[in-house]
Amino acid sequence: MNILQLGAPSAVLPSTATVQVGEGNDIRKGQAGDVAMGAAFNYLFKKEFPGSQITFMNCRKKFSKNDIDVINQYDVLIVSGGGLFLYDTFENNESDWQWGISEELLEQISIPIIVYAVGYNKFRGQRNFNSRFDKTVKVLVEKSLFFSVRNSGSGDAIKKHIPEYLHEKINLNFCPTMLLNEKYKLKHQTTNSVGFVLAGDRLSNRHKNIKQFSGEIKKFTDYLSKIGKKTILINHEHDTWSQNQIQFDDIIDLFQADARKTYETYSNMDTVVCDRGHAQMIPFSLGCKILTPISHNKLKWFLDDIQLNEFGIEENDSELGNKLIKQYMLQQKLDWENIYTDRMNKIKQLYLKNMNFIKAQLSDLNLN
C-alpha cells in the first residue's frame, strides 16, 4: 500500500517537498515534541502497515490542482499529528489552518482520507478562525474514512465549526507519542528529579503576567530545593528563558535531540512540571507524575481525558506556587503506579479499537 502522510514538519523543508519516510530519515527535526511525534508515526506505520511505502508531504503550502493530482496517485492519505488547527504557523487565505487547501480542491481528492490524532491548537486571545476554516474542515470531516483528534476538547471545538450531522464522525484518538515506549521499552526510574518544561514561544499568548508567573514557579522550585529535590530545566525549543529568573540545579537540552534521548530523559524524572502538550504526554506515558500550569486549553483537555484535571492549575492564578506545592504533596501520597497503569491501559484499548476500525475500512476497499 502506498501511503501519503500529510503534516507539518519541524524541519525546514521546501514547500513542494515530498520525502520518503524510513529509518534515518526523520522529517521532524528540532522541537523535541515534534521529533517524538515523527518517530511515533514512523513506528506506528511500520507496525500496523508492514511493507507499505510511506511518503511525507508538507502541508504548509498553497495547494494547487497539480498537488491534488499527485495526492490521487497514492492509495490512502493520512493527515497526521500535531496541532494542525492553528493559523499563525502558516497564515493563508485557503483554509485558515496549516493545510493550505481550498474546499474546492479538497473535494477533488479521490483517495481515502484518514485524519489521525490532530489537535485544535488555537491559543487563548487569538482571533477566531474565519469562514474558510469552517468550509474546509466540514469537507474534510465529510470525506474522511476516519477523523480523529488527540483530545476530547479538540473534538468539542471542531464540532462548533461543522454541522451537527457530522459530529458523530469525530473520534478521540490519543497522540501516538503516548505509545512510542513500546519501541524503546524504557523502565521508569525512581529518582528525586523534578523536570520543568516552560514553553518559551508565544509568551504573550501564554501568560497574562510573565513576572508573576516566574515568581510563582520560583516559589515552587525553592520549596523543592528545601526538601532535597533536584530541579531540572528541560528545553524542547526556546524553553530556557526562565533560567534568568529562576535558579535550577541543571539544564537538559532536548532541542535537536533524537526521540530516544527525550524518552530516556523523562524515564529518569519523578515529576514533570509542564506547559507544553508533549511535555505532558510523553512523561506521563513513561510513568512520571505531571503537574501543569495551564496556559493553553489543550493542556486542560488532556488532563480531562486522563481524569487527572486536579493536577492542572491556571497559569495566572495568584496562588500558583502554593497550589503546585499542595498538588505535588498530594501526588506523593497517591498510588501513582496504579493510576498510570489504569490510564495507559485505557489509552491502549482506545488505540486498538480505532486501528481495528481503520484496518476494516481499508480492507473493505481492498487496501491492506
Predicted regions and their residues:
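Active-site anion-handling motifs in enzyme catalytic cores
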Residues: M1-N368
